[in-house]
Amino acid sequence: TEAGELVLVIHSGSRQLGSDVATYYVDQAYRYQCKKQRKRARQSYYDDADAAGFIRQKSSQNSVQVKRETAVLEGSLLEKYLHDLDIVVSFADLNRQTIAKLICDHMGLTVTDRFSCIHNYIDTEYMILRKGAISARLGERVIIPLNMRDGALLGVGKGNPDWNFSAPHGAGRACSRTEAKYAFTVEEFK
C-alpha cells in the first residue's frame, strides 16, 4: 500500500467442491423436472379419459422434454442446494485462510487485518446471484483483482441498489486460461 504495508491477496475457490455440488444439483433438478412433467402428462390423461384425450396424452408424453441446463430446483431441493452452497462458501474461505497462514508463517509475517471478498456465488441471505461480481454493500470492504502486473483495487462498497449492491469481480482476462496455456511459456513469463 502507499503506507508501506504488505497486502497478501489469495485468489482461490473451493477447489472443485463448488463445481461438484453444482453438477449434483443440476442432475437433481433435471430428474425432479422430468418426474414432474411425467406426472402432469399422466394426470391430463386421467382428467380427459376419452379416446381423443388418450391420443393427445400419449403424444404429449412422448414430446415431454426437459432441458438439463434450464431445469429448476424447487421446495426442499432448493433449500438443500442453498444450504450446501453456504457450506461450499465457508470451505472456500477456510481454504484461503489456511493458505494465508502457511504463507505468513513461512515468511515470518504477522497478520494485522484480514477480510474475505467472495465472487461467483449466490448470496443466500439476500438471494442475489453474483457471477463475475462481488457484494459491495454500503461500507463493505471489497477487493477487485486487476491483473498480475497492476495487482488489485482495495475499496469500500457504495451499496447501490441499482447494481444489486454489487461490484465487478475483476478486470477480466486478455485470454482464457486454456488459450494462455498454449500461447505462452513459463520462460516467456519470467
Show which residues each predicted segment covers.
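Domain-length cofactor-binding catalytic modules of enzymes
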Residues: 1-190
